[in-house]
Amino acid sequence: MEKYEMVKDLGFGNFGLARLMRNKQTNELVAVKFIDRGYKIDENVAREIINHRALNHPNIVRFKEVVLTPTHLGIVMEYAAGGELFERISSVGRFSEAEARYFFQQLICGVHYLHALQICHRDLKLENTLLDGSPAPRLKICDFGYSKSSVLHSNPKSTVGTPAYIAPEVFCRSEYDGKSVDVWSCGVALYVMLVGAYPFEDPKDPRNFRKTVQKIMAVNYKIPGYVHISEDCRKLLSRIFVANPLHRSTLKEIKSHAWFLKNLPRELKEPAQAIYYQRNVNLINFSPQRVEEIMKIVGEARTIPNLSRPVESLGSDKKDDDEEEYLDANDEEWYDDYA
């Protein structure tokens, strides 16, 4: 940790505090997610690190390394100076159709890359999409704590994610196709960009998860009259918001849809994207750490050392009261009626 110096706090996420730090040797800014040593270093954390390390795509935040402090495990990654896409939408209310398409195109290309590596994210949302600091912002997917690799793991069974973005089949307590669930979440993200609200939440009662689940299961959504979007866009949403995942649009179908292809930037077209799918490119190790070294550090982080003297605290792990709520396999009561 000695090679990094503190710049500022970035806030709390799923696992703990994130900080902006500077590499004292290269002057490069990085984001570091700090997680308490001990019981919090669980399967989700290990999975996030291993899945993240394997990724090399411009629409995915790049993993750099893990570091260990006396009290925390630090996950060092690329810093996205533009902040969350959610914050950008919140500041303007909603996007024009053209702007929403611009970000949706990048989101789909990033998710398509994940799926090509047999990784499903399972918690795609606008808060987990960051922007770089360029004038035409590049979208970057982050936070792989809930991700599952179909190569290393069985099909997902647990109910995880953020309620407003969850697909109907996730509530059925049986195995589901994580890739199809990601497609549904991308549709929710597109809707929020266009409308400035969640498609299946009651704006008068947004914390009523049972009502949200009812609307999700019934695919009960509408586009308000004040939102003027093209027929092609409406049709795309209707093909994504399909209760039966077998009938839902696939990423391949979305990428060939007329609305998606309109004004598609050259770097997102198939010839430019092809390089990221070449086996030798994905084997390039952008992190100086080998998997064995990473897992050794993660293993050490599961123990809390006896400290002979006080060390600097990173601050409270208490999350903000208004932070987004998450579901996991133990949050069963409110969706019992839909299993």
Swiss-Prot record:
- This chain's protein is named Serine/threonine-protein kinase SRK2J
Q: What drives induction of this protein's expression? A: By salt and osmotic stress (at protein level).
Residue ranges for the region (Disordered) are 308-339
Task: Read off the InterPro entries from this record.
Answer: Kinase-like_dom_sf, Prot_kinase_dom, Protein_kinase_ATP_BS, Ser/Thr_kinase_AS
Q: Where is the active site?
A: 123 (proton acceptor)
Q: Which organism is it from?
A: Arabidopsis thaliana
**Keywords on record:** ATP-binding, Kinase, Nucleotide-binding, Serine/threonine-protein kinase, Transferase
Example GO BP? response to osmotic stress
Detail which positions bind ATP. Answer: 10-18, 33
Bias (Acidic residues): 320-339
The entry's note on the tissues where this protein occurs is: Expressed in seedlings.
Per the record, what is one GO cellular component?
vacuole
Give this protein's Gene Ontology molecular function annotations. ATP binding; protein serine kinase activity; protein serine/threonine kinase activity
